[in-house]
């Protein structure tokens, strides 16, 4: 869509307008933009841009970018923005910088974008200073420079910069962590209608001690009203957990649904879990998978993983290992360690793929490096049994130890067993017992309880040990460990 191709209702006024001064054209251009009468503005702004008014050139570029449909429209928009910037329009430079970041109508060039943001900021564009601050914070990780730029933009009443500056204080990025100062800046951002500022303030009240659920709710509501998906999602959490309000699953679901509709992948995945786990609604696995898949489409690693699990188990859908593999792969690519481990399980068992123990172990390693206890434990199993890797008890112990430190109960049990038997490590009954106890008493793992029961069963010197053995076999049985049930039955028969 070219400017020359556009016809608007202002044509009857052209003779009158042609007699106006360039200053009047520019003023009329701004007034029409303020009224959001973009069709009329385009004709007027074109004249004032030709007369050398930078703002009008910027406005033309914005209109074309907003309503353009082809790459040619973006190229034409970039041309107007370039002219605007050359005429020292701060907004024109800032917007053109964004074009270079995204490669809209121009060759993508982050260095050129930085140069343009720098010029915009020097021309006192709060937007330019903010975007330049983002470059220094995220790309260059120069916290001092980012802080200085956010401070300038915040002083120019740019709410997003106040929020980002607060975020730096909240997390201690390049400055001493200061929650009180962060909250002041979040409040200023929120007052400047930054939904991110309202959300961040709510987040601080919700999660930081001393927690203030009432203030968290107030600020999440402000953020949600301004269409912040994160604000709506966390407001849903408040109602699910009954924090400062009466627990209300329906209200929670409404807010989480809104967050999903605002394209929060996490919210869509959470909504899937609400239907899968019957949280305030009747279980509906078809709805669950619909929301999980939408979450996955929005790059929620959990959404992809739970979709894969339903295909793996054939719940709500026909069992399909190929589909499970596809969704585990995407989730793993999104750095979900548990999905990498589950994908490794498919290759380990040959489910929907040709069995490949070596590749399975590689996936377990990737999962473990992403701090998946399941992945570390599976890799420990591979080294213990020599599956896809050379058998190595020492390596097995290392990975069981890491998995146990990640609170994976099965691995704590296996680590204890290695100390019990002296596999890859000196025999140490004290460490064996300690790991069994963590597995059973702390992490409620049936296998660990079974091993702990066995530990006490072999201590035949007193009746107290026999009672403890019975206690832990009983717990193992209640946790679904069949061998624990069998040992418990033997003890009961003997009695």
Predicted feature locations:
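Alpha-helical segment of the N-proximal tetratricopeptide repeat
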Residues: 27-40, 44-47, 51, 66, ...
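Terminal, low-structured helical/coil segments at or just beyond the last alpha-helical repeat
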Residues: 475-495
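Short helix-capping/linker turns of helical repeat alpha-solenoids
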Residues: 36, 50-54, 66-68, 87-89, ...
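Classical Sec-dependent N-terminal signal peptides that target proteins to the secretory pathway
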Residues: 1-26
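Hydrophobic face of amphipathic alpha-helices that form TPR/SEL1-like repeat modules
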Residues: 31, 59-66, 95-102, 131-139, ...
């Amino acid at each position: 869509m070219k400017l020359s191709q556009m016809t608007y209702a202002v044509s009857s006024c052209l003779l009158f307008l042609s007699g106006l001064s360039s200053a009047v054209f520019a003023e009329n251009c701004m007034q029409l933009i303020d009224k959001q009468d973009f069709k009329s503005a385009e004709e007027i702004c074109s004249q004032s841009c030709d007369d050398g008014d930078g703002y009008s050139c910027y406005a033309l570029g914005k209109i074309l970018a907003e309503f353009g449909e082809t790459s040619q429209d973006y190229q034409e928009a970039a041309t107007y923005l370039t002219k605007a910037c050359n005429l020292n329009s701060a907004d024109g430079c800032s917007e053109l910088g964004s074009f270079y970041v995204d490669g809209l109508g121009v060759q993508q060039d982050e260095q050129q974008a930085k140069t343009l943001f720098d010029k915009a900021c020097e021309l006192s564009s709060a937007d330019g200073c903010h975007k330049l601050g983002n470059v220094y914070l995220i790309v260059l990780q120069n916290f001092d420079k980012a802080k200085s730029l956010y401070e300038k933009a915040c002083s120019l009443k740019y709410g997003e910069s106040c929020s980002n500056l607060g975020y730096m204080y909240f997390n201690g990025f390049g400055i001493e962590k200061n929650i009180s100062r962060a909250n002041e800046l979040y409040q200023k951002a929120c007052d400047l209608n930054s939904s991110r500022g309202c959300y961040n303030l709510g987040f601080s009240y919700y999660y930081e001690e001393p927690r203030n659920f009432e203030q968290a709710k107030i600020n999440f509501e402000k953020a949600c009203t301004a269409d912040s998906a994160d604000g709506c999602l966390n407001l849903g959490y408040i109602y699910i957990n009954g924090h400062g309000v009466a627990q209300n699953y329906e209200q929670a679901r409404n807010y989480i649904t809104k967050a999903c509709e605002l394209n929060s992948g996490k919210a869509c995945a959470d909504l899937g879990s609400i239907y899968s786990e019957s949280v305030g609604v009747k279980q509906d696995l078809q709805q669950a998978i619909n929301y999980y898949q939408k979450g996955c489409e929005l790059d929620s690693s959990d959404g992809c993983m739970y979709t894969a699990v339903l295909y793996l188990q054939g719940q709500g859908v026909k069992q399909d290992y190929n589909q499970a593999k596809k969704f585990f792969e995407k989730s793993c690519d999104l750095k979900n360690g548990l999905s990498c481990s589950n994908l490794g399980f498919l290759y380990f068992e040959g489910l929907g793929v040709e069995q490949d123990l070596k590749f399975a172990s590689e996936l377990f390693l990737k999962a473990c490096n992403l701090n998946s206890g399941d992945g570390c434990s599976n890799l420990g199993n591979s080294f213990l049994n020599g599956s896809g890797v050379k058998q190595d008890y020492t390596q097995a112990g290392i990975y069981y130890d890491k998995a146990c430190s990640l609170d994976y109960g099965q691995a704590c049990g296996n680590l204890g067993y290695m100390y019990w038997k002296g596999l890859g490590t000196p025999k140490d009954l004290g460490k064996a017992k300690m790991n069994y106890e963590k597995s059973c008493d702390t992490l409620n793992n049936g296998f660990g309880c079974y091993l702990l029961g066995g530990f006490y069963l072999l201590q035949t010197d007193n009746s107290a040990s026999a009672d403890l053995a019975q206690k832990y076999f009983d717990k193992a049985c209640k946790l679904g460990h069949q061998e624990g049930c069998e040992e418990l039955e033997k003890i009961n028969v003997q009695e």
